[in-house]
């Protein structure tokens, strides 16, 4: 199974593509889609969409796993990031991919074993689990890979996290 993990963001959207087979992970690609704050929001969203469209076309993931948004203060930021998340869902839907959502707590629990783990712990575990030479940077990339790992580990319960 090929999984595209996404950590949504408007300035930096992290992505990670992993192959999960026989209880083993193989990293296919990972990185960040960065947009400039000097660009208008519609242009930034277009940039994110076009890049995700390329990634989905190139790697043909079986599933797209997206981290749910969690904001407790800045509603303006939450709205713009929600737009970026919507663009990610749209890109996957246009390609008729299965879309799944996981909370940050679920992702940390799946990767570190503790739902309140620090970012550094997540990065370190991703490095170990995926046999990488160094922890992926920025954090958004490690988080996207963690979402993909979380989806792989959700096994028979994946249908519970499917976006309907």
From Swiss-Prot:
Aminoacyl-tRNA synthetase is among the record's keywords: no
Protein residues bound to Mg(2+) 2: 67
GO MF assignments: crossover junction DNA endonuclease activity; DNA binding; magnesium ion binding
Positions annotated to bind Mg(2+) 1: 7, 140
Catalytic activity entry: Endonucleolytic cleavage at a junction such as a reciprocal single-stranded crossover between two homologous DNA duplexes (Holliday junction)
Keyword list, A-Z: Cytoplasm, DNA damage, DNA recombination, DNA repair, DNA-binding, Endonuclease, Hydrolase, Magnesium, Metal-binding, Nuclease
InterPro entries, A to Z: RNaseH-like_sf, RNaseH_sf, X-over_junc_endoDNase_Mg_BS, X-over_junc_endoDNase_RuvC
EC id: 3.1.21.10
Pfam families: RuvC
Subunit architecture: Homodimer which binds Holliday junction (HJ) DNA. The HJ becomes 2-fold symmetrical on binding to RuvC with unstacked arms; it has a different conformation from HJ DNA in complex with RuvA. In the full resolvosome a probable DNA-RuvA(4)-RuvB(12)-RuvC(2) complex forms which resolves the HJ.
Similarity-based family: Belongs to the RuvC family.
UniProt-recorded name of the protein: Crossover junction endodeoxyribonuclease RuvC
């Amino acid at each position: 199974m090929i999984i595209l993990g996404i950590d949504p963001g408007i300035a930096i959207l992290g992505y990670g593509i992993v192959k999960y087979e026989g209880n083993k992970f193989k990293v296919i690609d990972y990185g960040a889609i960065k947009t400039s704050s000097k660009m208008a929001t519609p242009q930034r969203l277009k940039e994110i969409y076009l890049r995700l469209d390329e990634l989905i076309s190139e790697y043909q993931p079986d599933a797209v796993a997206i981290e749910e948004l969690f904001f407790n203060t800045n509603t303006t930021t939450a709205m713009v990031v929600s737009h970026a998340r919507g663009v990610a869902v749209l890109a996957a839907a246009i390609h008729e991919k299965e879309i799944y959502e996981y909370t940050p707590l679920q992702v940390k629990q799946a990767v570190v074993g503790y739902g309140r783990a620090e970012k550094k712990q997540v990065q370190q575990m991703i490095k170990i689990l995926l046999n990488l030479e160094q922890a992926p940077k920025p954090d958004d990339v490690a988080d996207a890979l963690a979402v993909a790992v979380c989806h792989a580990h959700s096994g028979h319960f994946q249908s519970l996290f499917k976006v309907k």
